[in-house]
């Protein structure tokens, strides 16, 4: 086995893996990621690193806090969700700005046997959610309306099973995140909202989570299929992650 096969096996077993002080360049970041499959198209909303359209550039400070400060799984509203993400810290605050990941395997295992059975055949609508706000930034002008309509048409919604089975591990997991799941199919609005509220609370348990305090040059890789993540907005200084 080559080193990338070994990294993939470690990822499948641990869901999130970390590399300290890599000082990896954008080109090396791209080349590393390409060893695990075809890269996803440029992000529908966020800007990219100059010269590298497939690398998302995230910049936050006290005047521009992260808009991903709720539990989410990356891009579940797309028809083809990227199976993994690789994030590199470029500039980070001395205090704050941590990222948390939560296990969707553990969330499934904590369900009662009755709920596991009830949820087995349920499907959910995953919607682009607050990304509409970015698409609609210039709605006063014609270009803003066109951009929102284009985004809704291309990335608007996707239907996914609430209980999924991981294609590699074969283990079941709870395929829910509060940011992008908009409705439970077959349920009324009130029923759907009640189920979503229960699942949001159910999945936010410290015992299922890991918290990472970033240092410049750190790199994290996670399995998008079986993790939810949250960026904290408790840092006053600038933080940049490319």
PLM region descriptions:
Residues 1-99, 131, 138, 156, ...:
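Non-heme Fe(II)-dependent double-stranded beta-helix
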Residues 22, 225-226:
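Short, surface-exposed secondary-structure boundary micro-motifs
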Residues 72, 226-229:
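Histidine-centered metal-chelating micro-motifs
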Residues 184, 222, 229-230:
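Short active-site-adjacent structural elements
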Residues 231-240:
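Conserved small/polar residues in nucleotide/adenosyl-binding loops
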